[in-house]
Design a protein with these regions (language model features):
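Glycine- and Gly-Pro-enriched alpha-helical subdomains that act as flexible
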Residues: 217-250
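Short, charged/polar low-complexity linear motifs in solvent-exposed/disordered segments
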Residues: 244-245, 262-264
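Extended, low-hydrophobicity, polar/charged segments
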Residues: 69, 250-251
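Accessory, usually C-terminal, subdomains that scaffold auxiliary metal cofactors
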Residues: 251-254, 284-285
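Conserved alpha/beta cores of soluble small-molecule-handling proteins
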Residues: 1-211, 215-222, 263-362
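Feature captures the catalytic cores and cofactor-binding loops of soluble hydro-lyases/lyases
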Residues: 255-260
Length: 362
């Protein structure tokens, strides 16, 4: 499975108790109860991944940059709401409250300064990990009694990276549409992600990513729709110059990054189609040489192009293998779109219409 490389955590984490509405800084290795609803049943266990950039500002100050992060915060709110009972919905903070909590109570804390100064000096990629947990020591299968938000920042060198090998895994599904869990960043979804990677390695040992189909397993495999990679969304670049983006649905995490990538590609003159993409169409286009590249798109890695995509049948027998058409203009365009996205954070490129760069002076 994709992993972070060159990871360095901040020395402090934030904890905010939702009932008491009280926040505090804790050491990065602070513990929660070993026995709880969250650790045993994954109840009230949701999270977010939010990219950020920290730069040196005039007068010796620092400035934090986030791109479209209110969408991350709204998605985090939806995950919390899903994990709480009807009578607990009032505990879910507003987007503006989450923004203030993370900026004012965490990033502006004096204890965070050395970490952020080091980041700014390196020009490193930053990643904020907010997550929720029930702080009560309990084994009862109920909604949380002591719900809290934690947040911790890190810097890193890269995530997934190129080249990587992906494998279609048709006999497992990441989430069920009827449960409406696939569009949320929930801990329960990611066990299936790592299990799918384990299955992919049985097919080809160099597998680093698994590509899921939809949950309609009774349909012929060719009629099933592609959903997403194990921990990221996907784009397909076609030889006719079109890029296909899978529509958002209860099976697919609404990626802030892929929404931005679609805007950037359109600004570069690329035709972006948002439509279902069946496995049968993928098979046909691979065999006809009509697929330029399959790409993984997500917060940490931004966009990585798959170097080898292995397609299988219902019996997990390999029926086709795709290698990207590196000579096609779209292959290089995808790389430029990735660089443009990161350049917005660093103020080397202006955000296009539909994308907002948030700046915070520290």
């Amino acid at each position: 499975m994709a992993k972070f490389e060159g990871l360095q955590w901040a020395s402090q984490q934030l904890r905010y108790m939702l009932i008491e509405k009280k926040g505090e800084l804790l050491a990065s290795d602070a513990k929660i109860p070993a026995v709880s609803r969250s650790t045993n049943y994954a109840i009230f266990l949701c999270f977010e991944g939010i990219r950020f950039f920290c730069k040196n500002a005039a007068g010796g100050g620092l400035e934090l940059h986030f791109l479209n992060w209110h969408k991350n915060l709204e998605r985090f709110r939806r995950g919390m709401a899903f994990n709480l009972g009807r009578d607990q919905q009032g505990l879910v903070p507003a987007v503006s409250d989450l923004e203030s909590l993370f900026i004012d109570s965490y990033f502006k804390a004096p204890a965070m300064r050395p970490f952020l100064e080091e980041m700014a000096g390196m020009g490193a990629q930053g990643y904020l990990r907010p997550f929720t947990v029930d702080e009560e020591q309990s084994i009862g299968v109920t909604f949380p009694n002591l719900p809290s938000i934690h947040a911790m920042a890190c810097r890193y060198d890269q995530y997934l990276g190129e080249p990587f090998c992906g494998v279609v895994i048709p006999h497992m599904v990441r989430a069920l549409g009827v449960n409406k869990t696939g569009w949320l960043k929930l801990g329960i979804n990611y066990l299936m992600s790592v299990k799918a990677i384990d299955e992919a390695k049985r097919i080809t040992p160099d597998a680093a990513a698994a590509l899921f189909l939809d949950d309609q397993t009774v349909r012929p495999i060719e009629e099933r729709e592609i959903t997403e990679w194990d921990s990221s969304c996907c784009l397909f670049a076609l030889k006719d110059g079109t890029v296909v983006k899978i529509p958002e649905s209860p099976l697919i995490l609404p990626s802030v990054t892929i929404q931005g990538m679609a805007i950037i590609l359109k600004g570069m003159g690329v035709k972006v189609e948002e439509r279902p993409f069946t496995y049968g169409e993928l098979l046909r286009r691979v065999k006809a040489g009509e697929l330029v590249a399959a790409a993984s798109v997500g917060t940490a890695g931004i966009l990585n192009r798959c170097q080898k995509l292995v397609l299988v049948d219902n019996d997990l027998k390999i029926v086709a293998t795709h290698a990207p058409d590196e000579g096609h203009p779209l292959f290089a365009t995808l790389r430029r779109a990735r660089e443009f996205y990161w350049d917005i954070y660093r103020e080397k490129a202006a955000p296009p219409e539909g994308m907002t760069l948030y700046r915070y002076a520290l």
